[in-house]
């Protein structure tokens, strides 16, 4: 169908394509459609199949051309992308530049479209990279074990009504809240109802945990909040807000006793509380190793990112921002649209820090995927069996069940990609030089800022 095509590479990993389709193809499709109409059309005064062509054209020419136009464009897209290696991103459909396309049956037809594609870049060989990473020496003590025991105790508690009816630290509270303007009118876009949180334990968006202590059921209060310049949510940082809050319910946790029976309730694998504590210690050691690997990989990707110019398309960045919004909304127990409403209504439309963080994460994803794609060693059936066996051991499902799940969901290729990804990360870690860092506690080490 395509007579010729001109392809231009534009900034932002964007591709511009000029497509030309021969007028002979256009005329052929038009005549075929006209003939089809002629054989089926019923017009008063004529038998079906006997309507003169000139009458059909006079009445339906523009509609016929529009149908042919749509068919030609769709056919051109299909033919072009069947051969073109630069594929469009799945979340960014091609866009036709011309606003009002029309067919002229006596001329070749041409149109221009643009689309965003996966960014191209080269990465240096891992073997040629000299990166040193300072890794803290992490120590654990009994308090780390106790903290995990307390977490399990809370998970296995029963939530009951607090008969005292007064908010205290660790109370589970349901509230309604809304921001107020300077005239104390409600800002409806910020209104939340039936928001549930644990006092002193939850990081609420407006940070009103301590402000509700001492309040009673159905009590309403207007809070005046001021936020420091480096507050965790930048849209609130350095600002002052009025917040109306109402207590709707107050509950508490009925905690189980921490003893051998408690350990047995957690899992059949534990006979005593000491068994549970030993498992927790082993699990903490695994977490430390995983965090150390994450720290080293972060260093690798940040170093490589600084050396690379990756022309990331706009739609890819927008998709990552959407993911970041979803994660933040979930952390704050908000719906996505509700969080966006609060986010944008605050006058905060963009953040350099947020964008930098998203770009950094996105670059890391692109780099690791590039390395996975370039990895010449194919995943064998033996590799798949080993990975399925590992997942079986960790999940309690049989190997057959896990394999059937991946096959039924058409995820075998995803599993192979994941195996390659782990192999690439292992190779990266083997080529990094680890320097002994300062001693830190387990609690400090798992803190995000230390592993940044």
From Swiss-Prot:
Reactions listed under catalytic activity: [protein]-peptidylproline (omega=180) = [protein]-peptidylproline (omega=0)
GO CC annotations, alphabetized: cytoplasm
Known EC number: 5.2.1.8
Domain of life: Bacteria
Domain PPIase FKBP-type residue range list: 170-256
Localization (cell): Cytoplasm
Gene Ontology BP, a term: protein unfolding
InterPro entries documented for this protein: PPIase_dom_sf, Trig_fac, Trigger_fac_C, Trigger_fac_C_sf, Trigger_fac_ribosome-bd_bac, Trigger_fac_ribosome-bd_sf, Trigger_fact/SurA_dom_sf
UniProt keyword annotations, A-Z: Cell cycle, Cell division, Chaperone, Cytoplasm, Isomerase, Rotamase
GO MF terms held by the record: peptidyl-prolyl cis-trans isomerase activity; protein folding chaperone; ribosome binding
Pfam families listed in its UniProt record: Trigger_C, Trigger_N
Summary of the function given for this chain in its UniProt record: Involved in protein export. Acts as a chaperone by maintaining the newly synthesized protein in an open conformation. Functions as a peptidyl-prolyl cis-trans isomerase.
Similarity annotation: Belongs to the FKBP-type PPIase family. Tig subfamily.
Domain statement: Consists of 3 domains; the N-terminus binds the ribosome, the middle domain has PPIase activity, while the C-terminus has intrinsic chaperone activity on its own.
Annotated protein name in UniProt: Trigger factor
Organism: Borrelia garinii subsp. bavariensis (strain ATCC BAA-2496 / DSM 23469 / PBi) (Borreliella bavariensis)
Gene: tig
């Amino acid at each position: 169908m395509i007579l010729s095509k001109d392809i231009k590479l534009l900034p932002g990993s964007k591709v511009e394509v000029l497509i030309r389709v021969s007028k002979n193809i256009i005329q052929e499709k038009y005549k075929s459609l006209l003939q089809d109409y002629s054989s089926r059309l019923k017009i008063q005064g004529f038998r079906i199949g006997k309507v003169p062509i000139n009458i059909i054209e006079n009445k339906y020419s523009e509609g016929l051309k529009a149908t042919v136009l749509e068919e030609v464009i769709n056919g051109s897209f299909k033919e072009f992308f069947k051969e073109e290696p630069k594929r469009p991103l799945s979340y960014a459909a091609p866009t036709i530049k011309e606003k009002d396309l029309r067919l002229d049956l006596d001329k070749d037809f041409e149109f221009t479209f643009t689309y965003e594609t996966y960014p191209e870049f080269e990465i240096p060989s891992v073997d040629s990279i000299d990166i040193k990473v300072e890794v803290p020496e992490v120590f654990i003590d009994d308090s780390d074990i106790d903290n995990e025991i307390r977490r399990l105790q809370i998970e296995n508690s029963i939530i009951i009504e607090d008969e005292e009816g007064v908010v205290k630290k660790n109370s589970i509270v349901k509230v309604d809240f809304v921001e107020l303007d300077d005239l104390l009118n409600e800002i409806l876009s910020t209104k939340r109802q039936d928001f549930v949180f644990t006092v002193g334990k939850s990081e609420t968006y407006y940070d009103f945990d301590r402000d509700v202590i001492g309040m009673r059921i159905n009590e309403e209060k207007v809070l005046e909040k001021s936020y420091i310049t480096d507050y965790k949510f930048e849209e609130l940082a350095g600002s002052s807000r009025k917040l109306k809050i109402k207590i709707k319910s107050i509950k508490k946790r009925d905690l189980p006793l921490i003893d051998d029976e408690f350990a047995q309730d957690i899992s059949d694998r534990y006979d005593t509380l000491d068994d549970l504590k030993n498992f927790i210690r082993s699990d903490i050691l695994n977490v430390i190793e995983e965090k150390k690997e994450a720290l080293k990989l972060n260093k690798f990707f940040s170093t490589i990112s600084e050396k690379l110019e990756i022309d990331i398309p706009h739609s890819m960045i927008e998709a990552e921002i959407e993911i970041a919004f979803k994660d933040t909304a979930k952390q704050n127990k908000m719906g996505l649209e509700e969080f966006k409403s609060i986010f944008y209504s605050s006058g905060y439309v963009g953040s350099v820090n947020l964008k930098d963080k998203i770009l950094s994460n996105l670059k890391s994803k692109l780099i690791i995927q590039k390395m996975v794609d370039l990895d010449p060693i194919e995943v064998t059936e033996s590799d798949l069996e080993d990975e399925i066996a590992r997942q079986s051991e960790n999940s309690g499902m049989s190997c057959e069940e896990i394999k059937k799940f991946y096959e039924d969901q058409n995820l075998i290729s995803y599993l192979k990609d994941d195996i390659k990804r782990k192999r690439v990360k292992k190779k990266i870690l083997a080529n990094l030089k680890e320097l002994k860092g300062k001693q830190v506690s387990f609690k400090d080490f798992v803190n995000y800022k230390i592993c940044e």
